[in-house]
Amino acid sequence: WIVMRDRHGVAHFTINDHQRVHQCGKFGLCGICGKPLGKHVKGNSNKGAFFVGGPASFYHDRGAFLDPPLHRECAEYAIRVCPYIANPSYGKRIDDATLKPEHMPAGMAVMQTGGNPPNLDTRPNVFILGLARRWEMFEPRPGVILFKVPNHRRDWVHLSAWRHGVELDVESREVKDEIFRRLMAAATGGV
């Protein structure tokens, strides 16, 4: 639902529609289907909402997500079919290279969120699907909307690791914790 569409209606899956991302955060809508997540997803509820991202988004003190919260079914769909996440041989640039300036919708501009666009060199080797009790939307600078979980040590209810669109078979909580500790160390350079 947040995928940017050009003047001809062509979807550009590597570009988010800023207005829709904002609507998701403000009104509690799923970033994939655009339907309400339900009143239980904000605040201190135990129900929560799902996020997909690399280990640093989940475990780093400043970790955040570009994509808004999702329904469980929508999150699992995304983690299974998104080429950047699920396809190990995906080799395209992950930025605005697919959008011709003359096809941009009226009144819309494409801006990078900072640094180089994600590419195969920066793609995590494992992605995480997480259920958060609470989440917040914030705008660190005009035009950039991010989502974060207030207390990443306490607010994650469930986490699962995925590689190439398949959930990793990890049985015990102790093994999961060790895997996530190692993933976080790798994602932050051992910090």
Predicted regions and their residues:
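Short linker/helix segments within small regulatory modules
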Residues: 54-68
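Short, flexible, mixed-charge glycine/proline-rich loop motifs
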Residues: 13-27, 61-65
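Short Cys/His-rich Zn2+-coordinating modules
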Residues: 4-19, 51-57
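A structural/positional concept
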Residues: 2-8, 27, 33
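Short, flexible beta-strand-to-coil junctions
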Residues: 34-35, 45, 54-56, 132
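Domain-exit/linker segments immediately C-terminal to small folded modules
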Residues: 64-191
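Short cysteine-rich clusters marking metal-coordination/redox-active sites
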Residues: 30-34, 71-74
